[in-house]
Amino acid sequence: MKNTNLTISIIGGTDGLGKWFARYLKNKGFNVIVTGRDIEKGKNVEKELGVEFTNNNIEAAKKGDIVIVAVPINVTERVIKEVAPHVREGCLLMDITSIKEIPSKAMEEHVKEGVTVIPTHPMFGPSTPSLLRQVVILTPSEKHKNTEWFNKVYNFLKKEGAKVIVIPPEKHDRIMGIVQGLTHFAFISLGATLKELNVDIKESRKFASPIYELMISIIGRIIGQNPYLYADIQMFNPRIKEIHETFINQCKEISEIVKNKDREGFVKIMKEAAKHFGSEAKRGAYYSDKAVFALTSEIEKLNKLIGKDVAVKNINSNVVHFGVLKDIEDDYLILNKNGKEQKFNILRVEVFAGDELSKLKKKHLEKKYIDVSVLFKKDVDEEVILNLLKKMFDIEIIDVYEGEKIEEGYKSITFRIYGYNKDELKNIEKEFLKIIKNIGGKERFK
């Protein structure tokens, strides 16, 4: 696709995943139009992303070579019926909702002859940095699979590093009924159960096994999302009803077995489930072990950094903070920044030390320096000394002097030592002079 020649209209592109695609595609050189009901928000997005905004869906559909419907699931069918008839012949209509049978049927029924339809489900959220290694599901009919537009979209996604899966919309909704529907239903039910039992989540974590920690984290992640989106996933997938009934029946059966103290019955169900999983049971154990290890090793790593210089990077905003890691309290780390304490949620930051810290300092901070003059005997090769010190400091020689006021048989070497703040330079100077003394030098003056 020649990006600069194509206009992509994103219906609902002022928020969520629609806005994500607006930014991503604009950065790839496409002309992008976004629509939304909130004019003030739309104008802000227009300015922020450098795209065109209109609150007229039909106008945007008429202009787009590619039209992407990116509205909430509960209004997707209505919006498709509104815009599909206005997509020009020879152009492409897509949607990016997480159900596929309803939008696929609506698009097929309401487009003109000669318009290609590619229902699409990106399996990621708007916090994802790029398409690299992300799953994107395409559900075109056979008619639209054998088109130039399909090849262009497929090849673009592959070129961007996405994992592209092509399946019929019916199969998609059956699979998503499990992958999203059952998963969300189970974890939201768990969260609601903990609420009904009035469980103090923070208190319970003090007694938690690693698996409980993982479960609580997953529940928290899911129930902290947009509840309307999750409601629509449950209510608009035609396959969900059967899945719910099966899940609830299994819960009732296991509950009855426990109530009757039927130990063998319980063992039978668990063994049969494990047999059904086959090798995936061991794979699940392996991945959960890795997740547990990651949780514990992260805390161990942070404990070893207490009292040391670190960089703390917010994984959402990418803002970087520098300071000394003072302590870890529950889910928070405490950073001493120039004498002031600041708390950061461990789950929302990355912590850097060593070489990674040095790279971040070079990128984000302005260098400062001190000059320190030391005396060495005349026959000492200052380049050898410098090469040794470079392994420990950001340092250079700015002067070598053997004239007046220099002790006989000695020469003065002035080093310029770099750092990023007064406290750091003070510590560096102390360490520097200690090393100088141990290799036969002595301080002259600063």
Swiss-Prot record:
In the Enzyme Commission scheme, what number(s) does this protein have?
1.3.1.-
For biological process, the GO terms are:
tyrosine biosynthetic process
Q: Which PROSITE patterns match?
A: PDH_ADH
**Top EC class per UniProt?**
oxidoreductase
Q: Name one GO molecular function term.
A: prephenate dehydrogenase (NADP+) activity
Query: Taking every annotated instance into account, which residue ranges of this chain make up the domain Prephenate/arogenate dehydrogenase?
Result: 6-288
The record's comment on protein family reads: In the N-terminal section; belongs to the prephenate/arogenate dehydrogenase family.
Fetch the PANTHER family from UniProt.
PREPHENATE DEHYDROGENASE (PTHR21363), PREPHENATE DEHYDROGENASE [NADP(+)] (PTHR21363:SF0)
Please state what the protein is called.
Probable arogenate/prephenate dehydrogenase
Which source organism does the UniProt entry give? Methanocaldococcus jannaschii (strain ATCC 43067 / DSM 2661 / JAL-1 / JCM 10045 / NBRC 100440)
